[in-house]
């Protein structure tokens, strides 16, 4: 079994760009940015519980990283960058810290490196369980209307929120709930020490209006790119800014 993905081929001799979407996204999420890099082969992945991978069950991060490895092998991807947003960024950091053959580097947009104490984890577990129950039992339009009122999305205007609610409501609530619980920050280890001791290139992107993740970025041993005129979902709010940062990173 492998993850559903869309592959687009570029020039030989360049590494692949493997894109991982955020919670409730899918393989289309990164394509506006990724298609600016047509010289590179691109793989747009559907994570477990999402899109074409919605039917794949998940028990924890080990399932996610194992299937990601198998998916890369199935596409014969030998050299690659992982590019992940939010949940996809956390998956990228987890997989990279566990070890991935052929990994050139990791580019994370708004991904959390992990909570640092038991109290924070317990609070996050309570919160994620409540959200998961809502995703399982309530209309997704109602759940996402509240989801996008969370402080991390404060930079969105009403039109942007309505657009995201309509888009995300096409998901399967039960499989979203399973993925939310399986990959909760409550069960993710704190990756700061591993990232400091890494052997791969590591870059971090965050929107200039995303104060929470700008503060987190300052804690990491990463080259940070601040995306102007953007909040938490920088590649959606300012795709040109993210394209410019990726182009700068990939030139090195």
UniProtKB/Swiss-Prot annotation:
Pathway(s) it belongs to: Quinol/quinone metabolism; 1,4-dihydroxy-2-naphthoate biosynthesis; 1,4-dihydroxy-2-naphthoate from chorismate: step 3/7; Quinol/quinone metabolism; menaquinone biosynthesis
Lyase as UniProt keyword: yes
Pfam families: Abhydrolase_6
Lineage of the organism: Bacteria, Pseudomonadati, Pseudomonadota, Gammaproteobacteria, Enterobacterales
Subunit: Monomer.
Family the entry assigns: Belongs to the AB hydrolase superfamily. MenH family.
Main function: Catalyzes a proton abstraction reaction that results in 2,5-elimination of pyruvate from 2-succinyl-5-enolpyruvyl-6-hydroxy-3-cyclohexene-1-carboxylate (SEPHCHC) and the formation of 2-succinyl-6-hydroxy-2,4-cyclohexadiene-1-carboxylate (SHCHC).
Gene Ontology BP terms: menaquinone biosynthetic process
Name the UniProt record assigns to this protein: 2-succinyl-6-hydroxy-2,4-cyclohexadiene-1-carboxylate synthase
Gene3D superfamilies linked: alpha/beta hydrolase
InterPro entries the record matches: AB_hydrolase_1 (IPR000073), AB_hydrolase_fold (IPR029058), SHCHC_synthase_MenH (IPR022485)
Record gene name: menH
Catalysis performed (reactions): 5-enolpyruvoyl-6-hydroxy-2-succinyl-cyclohex-3-ene-1-carboxylate = (1R,6R)-6-hydroxy-2-succinyl-cyclohexa-2,4-diene-1-carboxylate + pyruvate
Entry's EC annotation: 4.2.99.20
GO molecular-function term, one example from the UniProt record: 2-succinyl-6-hydroxy-2,4-cyclohexadiene-1-carboxylate synthase activity
Keywords: Lyase, Menaquinone biosynthesis
């Amino acid at each position: 079994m492998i993850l559903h993905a869309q592959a687009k081929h570029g020039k030989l001799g360049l590494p692949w760009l493997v894109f991982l979407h955020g919670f409730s996204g899918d393989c289309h999420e990164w394509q506006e940015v990724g298609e600016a890099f047509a010289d590179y082969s691109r793989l747009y992945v559907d994570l477990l519980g999402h899109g074409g991978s919605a039917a794949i069950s998940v028990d924890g991060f080990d399932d996610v990283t194992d299937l990601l490895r198998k998916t890369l092998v199935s596409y014969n991807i030998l050299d690659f960058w992982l590019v992940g947003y939010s949940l996809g960024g956390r998956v990228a950091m987890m997989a990279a810290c566990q070890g991935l053959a052929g990994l050139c580097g990791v580019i994370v947009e708004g991904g959390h490196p992990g909570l640092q104490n038991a109290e924070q984890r317990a609070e996050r577990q309570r919160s994620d369980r409540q959200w998961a129950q809502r995703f399982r039992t309530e209309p997704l339009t109602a759940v996402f209307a509240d989801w996008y009122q969370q402080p991390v999305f404060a930079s969105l205007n009403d039109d942007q929120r309505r657009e995201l609610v309509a888009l995300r409501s096409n998901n399967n609530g039960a499989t979203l709930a399973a993925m939310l619980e399986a990959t909760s920050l409550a069960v993710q280890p704190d990756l700061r020490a591993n990232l400091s001791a890494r052997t791969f290139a590591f870059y971090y992107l965050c929107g200039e209006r995303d104060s929470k993740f700008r503060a987190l970025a300052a804690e990491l041993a990463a080259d940070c790119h601040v995306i102007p005129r953007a909040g938490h979902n920088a590649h959606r709010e300012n795709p040109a800014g993210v394209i410019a940062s990726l182009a700068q990173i990939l030139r090195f």
